[in-house]
Amino acid sequence: MPTFPAVNLVAVFVAPLVTFAVAGIYWALVAPRLSGLLGGATATERMPASGLAVALATRFVLAYGLAVVIVWAAATSAAGGLVVGLTAAIAFALTIVAGQTAFGRGTWRDYAALVPQLLIEYGLMGAILAAWR
């Protein structure tokens, strides 16, 4: 059975807060314009508090898991963490969401608007976690 390495819990606490704020800015400023350019509707409704709470909570879980993978990958710089984060985004998040989209859970326009946000968020989180090891 594998043992989990020690990770910097301060970084695991800070990284989700930073990426949550960046995601909020992305969805407020970038995503509506991108969706409009792609021919989709620009959503103007506010996210419910319960949805935001779940989004934040899942980022803490993601940060811990990504921190463990960063230690296992021996990424010791922000650039190394960025690569691990982007790899995780492409290998896991984007593929899962693409599968859900293919089965009718969302549109491909929504997916196209989500891709940059996931790459930014995972990459930034990886960079923070690796730099702050």
Give the residues covered by each predicted segment.
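Juxtamembrane/disordered regions of integral membrane proteins
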Residues: 1-133
